């Protein structure tokens, strides 16, 4: 019967997608870091999202024009921003759309302290802010763990991948969420002294 066939096809696609995400998560290569204009990365992600999964959303750019270069792998950072925009778009009421704000700013005093006592200054701040319903309170503390999702059909690997990429960049990511406003904030380092700007 057609209904059963549709169900089987749908479940098969879901399983294939899940396996692809597990493979991507396990096969992530170390970042090839260089000086990166994070605004270029955000713009690429914005344009891609508006042509695809977040076409129903309004995306606002709120950038600090004096922001210096970040130290990172532009392709991996693009994946991070795409995942965050996709999550924001999926969280919004698709009939009404919603607004995503991409914000950057410089915070010279933000420092990541590691368990071994070492630390690193992470002055470049990137935020992806949406006006969706917010994250469920019961998963807030675990949202970056694999297989934790607030959506019925979510795999829980998108934000785990985001967290792994940011960690591999010696960065930090956090989330603050209330109904009507969710903010994912990434903090990244500047390039080491002597690294030339991108060509």
Mark where each language-model region is:
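Detector for a conserved hydrophobic position within an alpha-helical segment of the HATPase_c
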Residues: 166-167
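Conserved catalytic submotifs in the C-terminal HATPase_c
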Residues: 56-68, 107
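Short alpha-helical Gxxx[C/S/T] motif in the catalytic ATP-binding
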Residues: 158, 162
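Short conserved segment of the HATPase_c
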Residues: 121-123, 135-146
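Short beta-strand/loop element within the Bergerat-fold HATPase_c
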Residues: 97-110
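A conserved beta-strand-to-alpha-helix junction within the catalytic ATP-binding
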Residues: 34-46, 103-105
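Histidine phosphotransfer helical core of two-component systems
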Residues: 1-13
């Amino acid at each position: 019967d057609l209904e059963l066939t549709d169900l089987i096809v749908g479940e098969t696609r879901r399983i294939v997608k899940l396996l692809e995400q597990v493979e991507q998560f396990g096969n992530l290569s170390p970042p090839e870091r260089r000086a990166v204009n994070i605004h270029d990365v955000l713009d690429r992600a914005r344009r891609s999202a508006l042509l695809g999964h977040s076409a129903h959303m309004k995306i606002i750019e709120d950038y600090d024009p004096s922001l210096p270069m970040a130290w990172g792998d532009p392709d991996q950072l693009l994946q991070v921003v795409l995942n965050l925009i996709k999550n924001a778009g999926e969280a919004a009421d698709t009939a009404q759309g919603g607004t995503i704000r991409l914000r950057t700013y410089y915070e010279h005093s933000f420092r990541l302290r590691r368990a071994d006592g070492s630390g690193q200054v992470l002055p470049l701040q990137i935020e992806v802010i949406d006006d969706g319903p917010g994250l469920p309170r019961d998963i807030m503390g675990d949202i970056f763990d694999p297989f934790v999702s607030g959506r019925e059909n979510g795999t829980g690997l998108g934000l785990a991948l985001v967290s792994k990429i940011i960690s591999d960049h010696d960065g930090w990511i956090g989330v603050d969420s209330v109904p009507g406003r969710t903010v994912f904030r990434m903090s990244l380092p500047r390039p080491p002294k002597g690294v030339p700007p991108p060509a």
